[in-house]
Amino acid sequence: MALADMEIDGEMKKVLLQAPKNGFFYVIDRQDGKVLRAHPFAAVTWATHVDLETGRPVENPAVDYTDNGAWVLPGPLGAHNWQAMSIDLEAGLAYIPTQENPFFYAIQEDYKKTGVFKWTPGQWNMGCLLYTSDAADE
């Protein structure tokens, strides 16, 4: 996250720059909280874009994993995590440590049958099955 003064659409704005785990880089007006820009900075399949009116990502129906499962980017580790990013306003660049780790999400078979999620000791219990890209090779 970074604070900056930038020219946006011909007007100087005080902005917050943020690259969260969801894969979109946000430019947010610090005065009113409005999302001014939002573009992917890494591979993103779970959403098609960010609605600038609401500030919310628009989910991609093609990656609905309810019936058959789906590969999703970024995975639960995120496109960017706690590592610091850096901004060079003169060059117009943001330097962001990113990662692209796809995960395959699928609904647990037990849940499909019973409506109850199965808790498994020693695993991420997120209410769905998760597989890394390494698992696809096995």
Name each region found by the language model.
Residues Y131-A136:
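Conserved small/polar residues in nucleotide/adenosyl-binding loops
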Residues G75-K112:
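Long hydrophobic segments that form regular secondary structure
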Residues D9, A47-G78, K113-L130:
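Surface-exposed acidic, glycine/proline-enriched linker/cap segments
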Residues G23-F24, N101:
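Loop/turn residues immediately N-terminal
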Residues M1-P20, N81-S86, L93-T98:
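Repeat-blade elements of multi-bladed beta-propeller folds
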Residues L36-V44:
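Beta-propeller fold detector
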